Amino acid sequence: EFGSYVYLGEMITNIPFPPDSPIEDRCGSCNICVDSCPTGALVQGGQLDSKKCIAFLTQTKGFLPDEYRGKIGNRLYGCDTCQLVCPENKGKDFHIHSEMEPDPEIAKPKLKPLLHISNREFKEKFGHIAGSWRGKKPIQRNAIIALAHYKDRTALPDLIKLMHEDSRPIIRGTAAWAIGRIGDQSVLFELEKALEKEQDEEVKNEIVKGIEMLKA
């Protein structure tokens, strides 16, 4: 009736219910979701390699592997590609509960304001949604990657500030990588200056990546 657009949940009760009938596997020879997955996380037989899944990757707190940064694109949290392409979901009306409909400004927020949002502002604006449970750092990291995806040069001053001043290595390093993706020779000295003072080895590695991209 609803395709795969359902919330999964559990309720503990002592009421005896008759078991449901198993759902029929209607995939057959269809491989659309397998072929459409940006990172190849889906394999034959309905198996999922969660460590490749964008829905998983966007929730991690560390540096994202290089091979997935471009594939994540502009996603801040989660990924629905497999659901969007599934023939079983075509024509399904899952807009049943208006109170569950996402606010466009929350579901697709502007990227640059996320870079400097405070903990309090983040909790007030996003604290009620599932994407906030890991805190603001993964969302900010993903916003930096999204800005690099768009090659938004107007974000360079914000990214440079993060690279020099943010206390979190993940944010400093990802910002340095993004500067390398977006910028040109005019910002090379900012990366070189950051490299001289940086103490964290992982961040240094990201700065070097940024420098190499600008020199390529």
Swiss-Prot record:
Residues that hold [4Fe-4S] cluster 2 according to the record: 37, 79, 82
Keyword Metal-binding among UniProt keywords: yes
Annotated binding of [4Fe-4S] cluster 1, by residue: 27, 30, 33, 86
Keywords tagged on the record: 4Fe-4S, Iron, Iron-sulfur, Metal-binding
Top-level taxon: Bacteria
Swiss-Prot/TrEMBL GO biological process terms: queuosine biosynthetic process; tRNA processing
InterPro entries on file: 4Fe4S_Fe-S-bd (IPR017896), 4Fe4S_Fe_S_CS (IPR017900), ARM-like (IPR011989), ARM-type_fold (IPR016024), PBS_lyase_HEAT (IPR004155), QueG (IPR004453)
Gene Ontology terms for molecular function: 4 iron, 4 sulfur cluster binding; epoxyqueuosine reductase activity; metal ion binding
Gene3D superfamilies in the record: 3.30.70.20, Leucine-rich Repeat Variant (1.25.10.10)
Location of the 4Fe-4S ferredoxin-type domain: 18-47
Protein name per its UniProtKB record: Uncharacterized protein in gldA 3'region
